[in-house]
From Swiss-Prot:
Residues 399-410 have a biased composition (Low complexity). Required for pre-spliceosome formation, which is the first step of pre-mRNA splicing. 2 commitment complexes, CC1 and CC2, have been defined. CC1 is a basal complex dependent only on the 5'-splice site. CC2 is a complex of lower mobility and is dependent on a branchpoint as well as a 5'-splice site region. This protein is involved in CC2 formation where it binds to the snRNP U1-associated protein PRP40, bridging the U1 snRNP-associated 5'-splice site and the MSL5-associated branch point 3' intron splice site. Involved in nuclear retention of pre-mRNA. Signal peptide: none annotated. GO terms for cellular component: commitment complex; cytosol; nucleus. It comes from the Eukaryota. It comes from Saccharomyces cerevisiae (strain ATCC 204508 / S288c). This is Branchpoint-bridging protein. Changing R60G: In MSL5-2; temperature-sensitive; growth defect. Interacts with MUD2 and PRP40. The proline-rich sequence of this protein interacts with the GYF domains of SMY2 and SYH1. GO terms for molecular function: mRNA binding; pre-mRNA branch point binding; zinc ion binding.
Amino acid sequence: MSFRRINSRYFENRKGSSMEEKKAKVPPNVNLSLWRKNTVESDVHRFNSLPSKISGALTREQIYSYQVMFRIQEITIKLRTNDFVPPSRKNRSPSPPPVYDAQGKRTNTREQRYRKKLEDERIKLVEIALKTIPYFVPPDDYKRPTKFQDKYYIPVDQYPDVNFVGLLLGPRGRTLRKLQEDSNCKIAIRGRGSVKEGKNASDLPPGAMNFEDPLHCLIIADSEDKIQKGIKVCQNIVIKAVTSPEGQNDLKRGQLRELAELNGTLREDNRPCPICGLKDHKRYDCPNRKIPNIQGIVCKICGQTGHFSRDCNSSSQRMSRFDRNATVNNSAPIQSNDVHYNSNTHPIQAPKRSRYDNNSTEPPLKFPASSRYAPSPSPPASHISRQAQNVTPTPPPGLTSSSFSSGVPGIAPPPLQSPPESEQPKFSLPPPPGMTTVQSSIAPPPGLSGPPGFSNNMGNDINKPTPPGLQGPPGL
């Protein structure tokens, strides 16, 4: 009996031990470090003076501020104790390619990347705490950086047809410079697609040829507020480019206009509207413009409606203006612009005859004697020319008829003949005092004979002295 009892107890113990071993068996895919007690956990709670359990009632803003302070303290303890190694995971993401400095040391190890991540997180939390928590004091080992940077990724994969780089840069980079002035931060376009193909790397700033990240805007500033403002201005341009219909993007049209100004190809008339005097529209777009009645306009050349006489394309424009009886397409004769008057009521303003109508059989025009157009009466017989009567003018007092002549010295005048008796006038003038006969000419020069039929002296005395104060012609 005792033996059976011992055996039964032995087998029961064996069975229980096998069950315990079976329960204690660890699967091969389980990370044992996750189930072990963290040795640094006690140190974290020992250095962190903030309690993790809150018994009182807090508002939402107070809870958020308490979380920020607790996380800042937690990160500070990890950095002090060098507990910045992430938990080992079997299925983790692949590590980036190694990067080395000038001394050949690797700068992107696993620990360095995790430490940099914790430091960036603490910097952001400290900036938030300084603004929201009064009398907040940063940790002792905290050093505020001189510049902050962040990335805004552009949705190129969702909208491949939109030229985001061109909209952000603008004509010759003016849009990007304007964004930097508005946000007071430096904005650079980096990532895949930010550099044109064939661009030399020496002409670009450092980091511009890093094509590992997708297309993004790298924003650098000296405060977190400026970083957020820079992200917002970049986001506004991307949203406007995505939501605006084609051809209605005001930003793109403004950039094209500015580019035309820079190239000198902008053609814009800044003159005001001649109708209302405003500059925001053209004359044909003026709201005060009155459209004329085209059907009420009649051409004076062809007689048709719809156009002015100066715009008429009729062949009658090439016809002679003197052909007043010509007609075009059986229309009314072309009317002259001259004003016609009734000769009966206005005899003075009757049309004049043309100089080309000398051979016309029409009777000459007759005007009344009181009209200013009436011909002047013929002069009386007393107004007959002196040349027709062959009478020399009376010399002035003190001059003789022999010395008063219109001839040229040294040249004999042509012979003068008296007109026939039938043509002589019935009246004659008496000779001047001291003269018995009328002298017709002066004596010829010495050595020359007179004209045929006349004597050499011509009835004059060559030796007769000249009047006092006068000298004779040369050679006399």
